């Protein structure tokens, strides 16, 4: 920082030497990566705040129950489920190989993992609905020439368990006060607003050069991270399903 004069000939401090990445690398600068990482970390943290310890456990038990149910159904259809203990991921084999499953899954727009050694992998999460479960059952039943059994409510997956007692977590988690207070939409919105008011941004004043996570990130630029088209892409989706992503990557080259 150097001492200079402003347009009125009054003493003024100015930035005389800049070593910030954006000014050195210009369009090749990568400092936005810290903003991207911070955003996902904040979202994950607020997910924990909203659900709390009990909510997180309920979600986890729901995921595990669906995985156990699917494992039992697949074994009834003649598949071998090789993960004897699991949380949300199944490793599946069938004497007929993977092609019949692949064909049935593609017809319903479902992407699974097909290993070159002849087994199929799939993982479930909290976004999996009863309809999604019925579609998976349909795929594996059709591929094994079995009669599919469908469910019409989440109750079919409740109380199912396949985790050994020694692997069950016994230590408490998310016990800080903040994880016990904001479990409705209104409470959460007000909490986030209070946090926002504690921050300093371009809506209040100038911000110091170098504060890359404090620069203006308009909501319009951040909201799309929650869009299914961006964050819901299957990691093993075939290239014909990712035309939009390919265009974005080409534009960023």
Task: Put a short name on every predicted segment.
Residues 1-77, 82-84:
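Active-site C-terminal subdomain of aminotransferase-like
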Residues 23, 49-55, 81-86, 169, ...:
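Gly-rich Lys/Arg/Thr-decorated short loops/hinges at beta-loop-alpha junctions or inter-strand turns
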Residues 63, 90, 122, 210, ...:
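Buried hydrophobic positions in well-ordered alpha/beta secondary-structure cores of metabolic enzymes
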Residues 77-106, 124-127:
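Conserved PLP-binding catalytic core of the aspartate aminotransferase-like
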Residues 80-85, 112-116, 206:
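Short beta-strand
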Residues 104-107, 115-139:
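Noncatalytic alpha-helical scaffolds and linker/capping helices
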Residues 130-208, 212-220, 225-228:
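Flexible inter-domain linker/hinge segments
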Residues 184, 229-253:
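Conserved N-terminal alpha-helix of the aminotransferase class I/II PLP-enzyme fold
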């Amino acid at each position: 920082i150097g001492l200079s004069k402003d347009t009125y000939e009054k003493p003024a401090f100015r930035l005389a030497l800049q070593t910030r990445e954006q000014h050195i690398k210009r369009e090749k600068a990568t400092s936005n990566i810290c903003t991207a990482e911070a955003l996902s970390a904040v979202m994950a943290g607020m997910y924990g705040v909203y659900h709390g310890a009990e909510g997180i456990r309920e979600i986890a038990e729901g995921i595990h129950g669906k995985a156990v149910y699917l494992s039992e159904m697949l074994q009834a259809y003649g598949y071998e489920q090789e993960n004897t203990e699991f949380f949300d991921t199944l490793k599946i084999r069938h004497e007929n190989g993977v092609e019949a499953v692949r064909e049935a899954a593609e017809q319903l727009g479902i992407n699974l993992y097909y290993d070159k050694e002849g087994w199929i992998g799939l993982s479930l999460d909290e976004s999996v609905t009863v309809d999604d479960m019925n579609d998976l059952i349909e795929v594996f039943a059709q591929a094994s020439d079995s009669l599919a059994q469908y469910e019409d409510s989440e109750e079919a997956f409740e109380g199912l368990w396949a985790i050994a007692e020694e692997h069950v977590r016994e230590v408490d988690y998310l016990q800080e006060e903040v994880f016990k207070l904001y479990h409705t939409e209104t409470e959460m919105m007000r909490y986030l607003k209070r946090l926002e008011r504690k921050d300093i941004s371009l809506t209040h004043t100038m911000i110091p050069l170098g504060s890359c996570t404090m620069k203006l990130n308009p909501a319009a630029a951040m909201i799309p991270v929650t869009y299914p088209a961006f964050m819901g892409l299957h990691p093993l989706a075939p290239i014909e399903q990712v035309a939009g992503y390919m265009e974005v990557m080409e534009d960023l080259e």
